[in-house]
Curated annotation (Swiss-Prot):
UniProt KW keywords: Amino-acid biosynthesis, ATP-binding, Cytoplasm, Glycosyltransferase, Histidine biosynthesis, Magnesium, Metal-binding, Nucleotide-binding, Transferase
Catalytic activity: 1-(5-phospho-beta-D-ribosyl)-ATP + diphosphate = 5-phospho-alpha-D-ribose 1-diphosphate + ATP
Gene Ontology CC: one annotated term: cytoplasm
The enzyme's E.C. designation: 2.4.2.17
Name of the protein described by the UniProt record: ATP phosphoribosyltransferase
Organism: Vibrio cholerae serotype O1 (strain ATCC 39315 / El Tor Inaba N16961)
Pathway(s) this gene product operates in, as recorded in its UniProt entry: Amino-acid biosynthesis; L-histidine biosynthesis; L-histidine from 5-phospho-alpha-D-ribose 1-diphosphate: step 1/9
Documented activity regulation: Feedback inhibited by histidine.
Length: 298
């Protein structure tokens, strides 16, 4: 089923949903999400947002129901493996890995348990919401185990006597710590990713996708970059430039009153830390300003 409007699936609720919405707004897509609506129409572009459960998004893409989808790589790979096992459609194209939504799927055991490696999990029962990712990892390790399938509160399984270990998503590790568990193996590293359905697109829809990708790249580049302005002694300019990794060569302008210094303007492709600013100061730089960049196009 195809329409003239670009259909983008995003998670209905949660932090990933908020970050995807913020990214689209920074890309110039205007919309108002109100109430429990499933479909939200953009106010200024031929784009519809579908607000759905995160684990529904890969299937909607693979079945060609929607054009694009933002989803965590952990959910995407779990769905792909599940559909592969069931001989169902599992094709998609990854367009861009995002710089948000980071987490990892890890195996954790009770804090006081001895652990020497994956072979210690032989014959154990492991609780998880990601059975396919867990099985793929254990098969690579040659470990025989059984799965306890849970859809929530996986971390309480060992304490409740349901399992010997768990395989669950970890961000900071605070939840594991609170439940007397320790992380012992990382199964899968994940971030949010933008995926596209299989098949060709009409020219206008393909052009709109390219426009969005260009803007997303600009938003991410702006987030990772800073605009730097400073006054630098002419004789120290070469040394100062080595401290400032830039997207391009800096703009160097003469000062009206002080001929021994120049004004340097540049976009730095890396974060400028206090230590770097102190090094610049030590080389005679002054009036150092570091500014955020809202949008950027190379």
């Amino acid at each position: 089923m195809q329409t003239q409007r670009l259909r983008i699936a995003i998670q209905k609720k949660g932090r990933l949903s908020q970050e995807c919405q913020e990214l689209l707004k920074k890309c110039g897509v205007k919309f108002n999400i109100m109430g429990e609506r499933l479909v939200v129409h953009s106010l200024n572009m031929p784009i519809d947002l579908l607000l759905v459960r995160d684990d529904d998004i890969p299937g909607l893409i693979m079945d060609g129901v929607v054009d694009l989808g933002f989803v965590g790589e952990n959910v995407l790979e779990e769905t792909r493996l599940d559909r592969l096992a069931l001989n169902q459609r599992n094709e998609f194209t990854t367009l861009r890995r995002m710089d948000f939504g980071g987490c990892r799927l890890s195996i954790a055991i009770e804090k006081d348990a001895e652990y020497r490696g994956p072979q210690d999990l032989n014959g154990k029962r492991i609780a998880t919401t990601y059975p396919q990712l867990l099985k793929a990892y254990m098969d690579r390790q040659g470990v025989d185990f059984s799965t306890c399938m849970l859809t929530g509160s996986v971390e309480v399984a060992p304490r409740a006597g349901l399992a010997d270990a768990i395989a669950d998503l970890v961000s900071t590790g605070a939840t594991l710590e609170a439940n007397g568990l320790k992380e012992v193996e990382v199964i899968f590293e994940s971030k949010a990713t933008l995926i596209q359905r299989p098949g060709a697109f009409a020219a206008d829809k393909a052009a709109l996708i390219d426009k969005l990708l260009t803007r997303m790249h600009g938003v991410q580049q702006a987030k990772e970059s800073k605009y730097i302005m400073l006054h630098a002694p002419v004789e120290k300019l070469a040394q100062i430039k080595t401290l400032l990794p830039g997207a391009e060569d800096p703009t160097v302008l003469p000062l009206s009153a002080d001929k021994s210094k120049v004004a340097v303007h540049m976009v730095s492709s890396e974060n400028l830390f206090w230590e770097t600013m102190e090094q610049l100061k030590a080389l005679g730089a002054s009036s150092i300003l570091v500014l955020p960049i809202e949008k950027m196009m190379e």
